[in-house]
Curated annotation (Swiss-Prot):
GO molecular function: RNA binding; structural constituent of ribosome
One example of a Gene Ontology biological process annotation: translation
GO annotations of cellular component type: cytosolic small ribosomal subunit
Gene: rpsI
Organism: Aster yellows witches'-broom phytoplasma (strain AYWB)
Family named by the database record: Belongs to the universal ribosomal protein uS9 family.
Keywords (A to Z) from UniProt: Ribonucleoprotein, Ribosomal protein
InterPro entries per record: Ribosomal_Su5_D2-typ_SF, Ribosomal_uS9, Ribosomal_uS9_bac/plastid, Ribosomal_uS9_CS, Ribsml_uS5_D2-typ_fold_subgr
Protein name: Small ribosomal subunit protein uS9
Length: 130
């Protein structure tokens, strides 16, 4: 079988994930480490492989990920979006399934900036009436 690479990029908060799907056996590596070792929490692991499980392509592709920035949860979200985009590049018919389950939507929520005159983004200094 010919080695074919499919690419996808995902972002979440300040994390950026570059995903490469290759025909293979289902091996997942993140930053050259096994994904079970990189993501210790089962919830983040499940979130990350959601597109592969939904489309039943878990055993069909090897996934290689380069991710940086943010925390582990944000990185898992970025990887999830990257995998979904790479799956569409490989098999365009999967778009409807992934779109319906919301896996192609970029989560635009990010940290609100701190404003001057306030202690945090919205927290005002304590008010004293007298």
């Amino acid at each position: 079988m010919k080695k074919v690479n499919y690419f996808g990029t995902g972002r979440r908060k300040s994390s950026v994930a570059r995903v490469i799907l290759t025909n293979g056996t289902g091996k997942i590596t993140i930053n050259t480490r096994d994904f079970e070792k990189y993501l210790p929490l089962p919830a983040t692991r499940l979130e990350m492989i959601q597109p592969l499980e939904l489309t039943e392509k878990r055993e069909v592709f090897d996934v290689s990920v380069n991710v940086n920035g943010g925390g582990l949860s944000a990185q898992a979200g970025a990887i999830r979006l990257g995998i979904a985009r790479a799956l569409i590049e490989s098999i365009p018919e999967l778009r409807a399934i992934l779109k319906k389950s919301g896996l192609l939507t970029r989560d635009a929520r990010c940290v609100e900036r701190k404003k001057y005159g306030l202690k945090k983004a919205r927290r005002a200094p304590q008010f004293s009436k007298r």
